[in-house]
Amino acid sequence: MNQTRVFLIFAWLMVAALLWMEWGKDKAAANAPVVAATQSVPAARDLDAATPSAANVPAAQAIPQAGAPGAVPATSTTAATPAAAGAAPVVTLTSDVLRLKLDGRSVLDAELLQFPQTKDGTAPVSLLTEDPAHPYNATSGWASEHSPVPGVGGFRAEQPGTTFDMAKGQNTLVVPFVWNGPDGVSIRRTFTLERGRYAISIKDEVINKSGAPWNGYVFRKLSRVPTILSRGMTNPDSFSFNGATWYSPQEGYERRAFKDYMDDGGLNRQITGGWVALLQHHFFTAWIPQKDQASLYVLAQDGPRDVAELRGPAFTVAPGQTASTEARLWVGPKLVSLIAKEDVKGLDRVVDYSRFSIMAIIGQGLFWVLSHLHSFLHNWGWAIIGLVVLLRLALYPLSAAQYKSGAKMRRFQPRLAQLKERYGDDRVKYQQATMELFKKEKINPMGGCLPLLIQMPIFFALYWVLVESVELRQAPWLGWIQDLTARDPYFILPLLNISIMWATQKLTPTPGMDPMQAKMMQFMPLVFGVMMAFMPAGLVLYWVVNGGLGLLIQWWMIRQHGEKPSKIIQANAK
């Protein structure tokens, strides 16, 4: 198989894959739920009113009560006590990385202070929001069949004031809330924020000073009306996965896009040692329960809202006793280094390089190399260039073998032409004679395909690394490239890519190519140039450097095998 056919296979595989991704976005946009402009969507704080029994979800499975292994609680309903005086005041908690607005039960709004919405803007990304059209919040509540539990507005801050800021030099911000129920039952909830951390610790202590046992379970949910993303290559957000993900030690990492949210009846599964999250481009929210806690994982829809929920085990607090439970709520970016510090199994998969484990592993490896290069070079653009150089060096033996195979095939082109002339239209005899020739001369006609098969998964894994890595978000390279995750504003890199592909095409020997293949080859640089024009600049930078190094390597290989580049260029010009 000559170099040209290998190139064509590689090119058309790329075109097919990119068209498939584009078709997927088109299908997603067509099937996505659309909230009409006149439709009334409850405000974000109204989302808290929907308890597990109010949402359209399956009944809770049996989860053993704490202290009574194997016991099965009755089907849970909510018996929430009304708020003492309407909705609780909204309290603002601010650390160095987060600004949260919450009422003790729900986080209503969350701003990521170190991530501006635009390159030149000052407003931070608002991940959780009270936007009436697309509310998105995180709730932690209590439910019980018979015992009183806090309802909406039930929790109140213990300390006076509505604003709590992490002071300079302070590494931890602790803000307690309390619900005082009837008959001496109370729940003390403590929010803990740490400097530089996006995981919020939430601990509940149930204090029973009544004369009767108290029964209940905690539920934690993420609820949002998904934003309808505009489809297209010019919108990088539409290429990233948007939906729910969860992890279990038994099944591993699983995910469900918003457009397919209720496929197979949603989710209703008991899991120990897992987590649940809602993902979008560069950012995510997640509930992470205690490692040894069994929870019922539920995906459901409540009107226009998609809900991902955990229901903890039911437990009983005897009179005069105290019981506690805690969890972490992640509200922040997909920063690999900070996610690793949480020490949660499988949580690294929220950086969604691929749903396939092998591709995810390749992506994680590429990012590991990329991040280490960045630690030396202090620029993500130069780190990408460094990664290309390392990949080219690692794949050089394969490239050399590929060219050697192609050169050997070209030397035997006259003999293959003689065989074709000898056997005419008898394709069977021609193929038999060809295979005998290959066997005798030790020619592997598929020798040029091995480097292609190895490079394809690396290329696509790198594509997702560059699309998914929030570390590259708004990261400049030099000059006109001020955001490696956005397209080249002046199309300089795509034009360079076209030029390099055209030069590579001219330097590629094409013996025996039929006219149809020749025409296809002429249009390939232009087709790729148009596609690359709207892709992230970091990816096009990779492709330009990779193509440029490939061109130099091909020039070197031609000379090494006794061929003259000028003759190949002249032959291709005919």
Curated annotation (Swiss-Prot):
One of its GO terms (biological process) is protein insertion into membrane. GO terms for molecular function: membrane insertase activity. PANTHER family: CYTOCHROME C OXIDASE ASSEMBLY PROTEIN COX18, MITOCHONDRIAL, OXA1. Pfam families: 60KD_IMP, YidC_periplas. The lineage of its organism: Bacteria, Pseudomonadati, Pseudomonadota, Gammaproteobacteria, Lysobacterales. GO terms for cellular component: plasma membrane. It comes from Xanthomonas axonopodis pv. citri (strain 306). It is found in: Cell inner membrane. Required for the insertion and/or proper folding and/or complex formation of integral membrane proteins into the membrane. Involved in integration of membrane proteins that insert both dependently and independently of the Sec translocase complex, as well as at least some lipoproteins. Aids folding of multispanning membrane proteins. Keywords: Cell inner membrane, Cell membrane, Chaperone, Membrane, Protein transport, Transmembrane, Transmembrane helix, Transport. Interacts with the Sec translocase complex via SecD. Specifically interacts with transmembrane segments of nascent integral membrane proteins during membrane integration. This is Membrane protein insertase YidC. Belongs to the OXA1/ALB3/YidC family. Type 1 subfamily. It comes from the Bacteria.
